[in-house]
Every structure is written in structure tokens, then in C-alpha cells.
């Protein structure tokens, strides 16, 4: 499914009558339950392409697009795409409740983007407040929805969301996800290039967090297997960790990793929808409440089901390099988690 999304879009461009083929190849099956997805921050750099990709997903029957401005235009534009879902735009805080009501999945790409020289933590003061406000509304209007957190720094915004939901009495650790899928997408792409294997066949788990050294791709577990040198593995790991910076610098101050993030967000949302619909053996990496390490939140492989997280999978065997990386990331990840918790409880 994952590798076929972009092929399907290209197919649709060349054959205007192929919309049904597009859908069947892009995302899953057509005979599915009614599912509402809300995108909060839908007029932004990630939100707009993400809205389009969710419109292409036949598992979605209602698509609610929310932002503080600009969503009526985005909704009108995306709404003309001839696919199953009904699209509605909502603008301003007074319409947030309507956007959220009845949602099965809420995707949150809201917030300010990275700029040259900025780290994800530089975004904290602005995005933390945005996330807290949105999660307060989620707790009120759709407390049972699966939450897909994209807003950075994810290592802190997921703990913020958890604290908001705890205070509201609605917290369910099985329903809160930090979307780290872009790290997996990058790791697969970079590995395929070095291993000279088809990227569609590649699988690479990525654990830890979603910023800098907290991102730890497990290339020792990558498939198909390839005999890569230690230096190559180190370089691949570094490039995966710095992937966001690579895009920010390439765009020369005019954007961040919006398109690839939208793609990754759409992949993870699709996995959540499949899990909700009872599709078996849906496994993705995500930053969730976890006991696989001593840290309260951690990214690893997660099995998705009808209630969200069905199980958090073990890390599996690690190479010596990965064991070292795991120990190095823990202090930074712990500090980011605590920063989010402190923000939520102090404001």
C-alpha cells in the first residue's frame, strides 16, 4: 500500500477516468465503516498536502479541516476531488468543537514550522501552547478519538497532550500517538539507496524519539539484509537524524519538510484507520506511552487495533552501535518529556 500511493497519483494524472483504480491502489478497500478524520492546522504547509492525501483515502467518509484562517478555501479546493469523503472547512476557535465532534482520528500538524538554525525545541514555546489549547478541546468534543500528534517537538507535545487529557479525565494511553513515521520513511529511503535494493521492499524500525540523536534507526534489523560497512551505517544513522535539517537548509529559509511529512502523516493515519476497522497485523513505529525502557514515552513498533494501541512490541536485538545510541538518547529524550509535562502542569 505505502509504495503505491504516489504511483497511483501519477496513474490518475495520465488516465483521468482511473479514480477508482487510484483509490484501490492507494489505500485499502472500498467497503468500509464510516470514519471521520479531523486535521487541525489544515491550511498550513503540512496541513494542505495532508488534507489532499486524506481525501484520497477511501477509509475516510468525513474530512474536517480546521485552522485559524484559510480553511474554507482549502476545503473548497480539496472538496472538488472526486473521492468518497465529504469535506468541511472550519475556521476560528468558535468552530473547533464542530470540527472535532464525532471524529475517529484527529491529526495535529498545527504550529509554526522550522526555519534555518532552529531545532525542534526552538519551536517549543509557541507550539506547546497551541497543542495544549487544541487538546483541551479534543478532551471535550471527541475524547475517544485516536490522536496523531505531528506538531513539534513531538518529544514534548505528546507528554503535554497526555497531561491535558489526564486533567480532563479522558486520558487513554492507547489512543495517543506521536507520529514518527517520517523518520521511518527517511531511513527506508536512505537505506535502499546504499543497499541498492527496491525501496518498496525495505523495512527499517526507528526507535527513541523524534528529534536529533533521539532518532535511532535500527539498521541491524533492516530488511532486505545488506552487508553495509560500519561507517556506512553510522552515516545513514546521522543522515536519518538530520533529515529535517537537510530539507530546511535546502529550502533556504522558505520552508521545512512539509511534503514528506504530509506523506508520512497520511501513512500513519491510514494505519490507524485500518486498525480501527479490524485489519489484522497492522504494525507501525510511533512515540507512545511505553514500558520498553525506563522512560514514560518511547518510539518503537506498535501493533494497532480497534482501540488504538493493541501492544507495544519489544525492541528486538540491537547492535553494539545501536545499544550505545540508545543510552546516548535517553537523557535528552527524558529532558524533553519532562519539559512537556512541566509546561502542561505550570500553565
UniProtKB/Swiss-Prot annotation:
Targeting presequence: 1-27
Subcellular location: Mitochondrion matrix
Gene Ontology cellular-component terms listed: mitochondrial matrix
Single GO molecular function: L-malate dehydrogenase (NAD+) activity
Keywords assigned: Allergen, Mitochondrion, NAD, Oxidoreductase, Transit peptide, Tricarboxylic acid cycle
Source organism of this protein record: Citrullus lanatus
Gene Ontology biological-process entries: malate metabolic process; tricarboxylic acid cycle
Disulfide cysteine pairs (residue numbers): none
Chief localization: mitochondrion
PANTHER family: MALATE AND LACTATE DEHYDROGENASE, MALATE DEHYDROGENASE 1, MITOCHONDRIAL-RELATED
Name of the featured protein: Malate dehydrogenase, mitochondrial
Subunit text: Homodimer.
Residues that, per the record, bind substrate: 114, 120, 152, 186
EC number(s) on file: 1.1.1.37
Catalytic activity: (S)-malate + NAD(+) = oxaloacetate + NADH + H(+)
Gene symbol of the encoding locus: MMDH
Residues reported in the UniProt entry to bind NAD(+): 41-47, 67, 127, 150-152, 261
One Pfam family it belongs to: Ldh_1_N
TM annotation in the entry: none
Active site: 210
InterPro entries, sorted: L-lactate/malate_DH (IPR001557), Lactate/malate_DH_C (IPR022383), Lactate/malate_DH_N (IPR001236), Lactate_DH/Glyco_Ohase_4_C (IPR015955), Malate_DH_AS (IPR001252), Malate_DH_type1 (IPR010097), NAD(P)-bd_dom_sf (IPR036291)
Family: Belongs to the LDH/MDH superfamily. MDH type 1 family.
Keyword match Oxidoreductase: yes
Amino acid at each position: 500500500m505505502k509504495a503505491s500511493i504516489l504511483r497511483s497519483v501519477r496513474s490518475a494524472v495520465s488516465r483521468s477516468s482511473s479514480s477508482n483504480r487510484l483509490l484501490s491502489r492507494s489505500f485499502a478497500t472500498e467497503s468500509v465503516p464510516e470514519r471521520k478524520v479531523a486535521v487541525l492546522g489544515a491550511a498550513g504547509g503540512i496541513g494542505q498536502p495532508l488534507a489532499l492525501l486524506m481525501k484520497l483515502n477511501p477509509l475516510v467518509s468525513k474530512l474536517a479541516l480546521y485552522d485559524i484562517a484559510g480553511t474554507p478555501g482549502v476545503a473548497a479546493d480539496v472538496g472538488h476531488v472526486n473521492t468518497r469523503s465529504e469535506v468541511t472547512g472550519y475556521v476560528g476557535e468558535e468552530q473547533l468543537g464542530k470540527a472535532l465532534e464525532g471524529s475517529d482520528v484527529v491529526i495535529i500538524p498545527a504550529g509554526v514550522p522550522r526555519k534555518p538554525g532552529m531545532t525542534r525545541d526552538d519551536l517549543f514555546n509557541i507550539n506547546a501552547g497551541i497543542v495544549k489549547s487544541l487538546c483541551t478541546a479534543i478532551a471535550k468534543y471527541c475524547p475517544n478519538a485516536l490522536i496523531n500528534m505531528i506538531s513539534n517537538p513531538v518529544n514534548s507535545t505528546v507528554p503535554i497532550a497526555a497531561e491535558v487529557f489526564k486533567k480532563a479525565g479522558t486520558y487513554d494511553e492507547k489512543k495517543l500517538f506521536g507520529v514518527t513515521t517520517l523518520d521511518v520513511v527517511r531511513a527506508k529511503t536512505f537505506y535502499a539507496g546504499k543497499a541498492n535494493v527496491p525501496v518498496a521492499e525495505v523495512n527499517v524500525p526507528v526507535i527513541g524519539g523524534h528529534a536529533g540523536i533521539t532518532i535511532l534507526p535500527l539498521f541491524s534489523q533492516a530488511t532486505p539484509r545488506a552487508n553495509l560497512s560500519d561507517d556506512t551505517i553510522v552515516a545513514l544513522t546521522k543522515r536519518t537524524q538530520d533529515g529535517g535539517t537537510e530539507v530546511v537548509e535546502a529550502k533556504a529559509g522558505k520552508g521545512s519538510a512539509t511534503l514528506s511529512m504530509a506523506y508520512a502523516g497520511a501513512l500513519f493515519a491510514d494505519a490507524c484507520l485500518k486498525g480501527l476497522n479490524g485489519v489484522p497485523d497492522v504494525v507501525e513505529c510511533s512515540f507512545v506511552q511505553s514500558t520498553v525502557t525506563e522512560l514514560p514515552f518511547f518510539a518503537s513498533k506498535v501493533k494497532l487495533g480497534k482501540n488504538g494501541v493493541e501492544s507495544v512490541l519489544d525492541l528486538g536485538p540491537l547492535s553494539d552501535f545501536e545499544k550505545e545510541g540508545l543510552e546516548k538518547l535517553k537523557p535528552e529524550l527524558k529532558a524533553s518529556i519532562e519539559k512537556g509535562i512541566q509546561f502542561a502542569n505550570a500553565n
